[in-house]
Amino acid sequence: MPGVTVKDVNQQEFVRALAAFLKKSGKLKVPDWVDLVKLGKHKELAPSDENWFYIRSASTVRHLYLRGGAGVGSMTKIYGSRQRNGVCPAHYSVGSKNVARKVLQALELLKMIEKDPNGGRRLTAQGTRDLDRIAGQVAAANKKTV
């Protein structure tokens, strides 16, 4: 659909569609250790979804589309959560820096994002085009079901 952007569609549906696109393209470099790793020290278990790397990549690209200029540290804050400490009070804990770094590096290899001279990463023109195209597909699919 012309004129539809990422901001116009449901974020959950968009992230699922973008993750499916990244998986289907086969170009996203997925590390070997994805089935062994936790996503932060606040997590007790590894993710149960085997496609979590594609979903995290799609979520990261969407975040960069909305608020460019985010780096590894920003991504760890976004994906952080409450850490339970047993009988002690809970505190905030950041997400895994290695996962955030590998996601950003994999997206750089796809030429969807690039390093920003002011710090962090930002979307490329090709990345913006891809995201708007997928948003148009999601909007068209929603229009058919309504």
Curated annotation (Swiss-Prot):
Keywords per UniProt: Cytoplasm, Nucleus, Ribonucleoprotein, Ribosomal protein
Subcellular location: Cytoplasm; Nucleus
Cellular compartments per GO CC: cytosolic small ribosomal subunit; nucleus
Function text: Component of the small ribosomal subunit. The ribosome is a large ribonucleoprotein complex responsible for the synthesis of proteins in the cell. Required for pre-rRNA processing and maturation of 40S ribosomal subunits.
Similarity section: Belongs to the eukaryotic ribosomal protein eS19 family.
Assembly, per entry: Component of the small ribosomal subunit.
Protein's recorded name: Small ribosomal subunit protein eS19
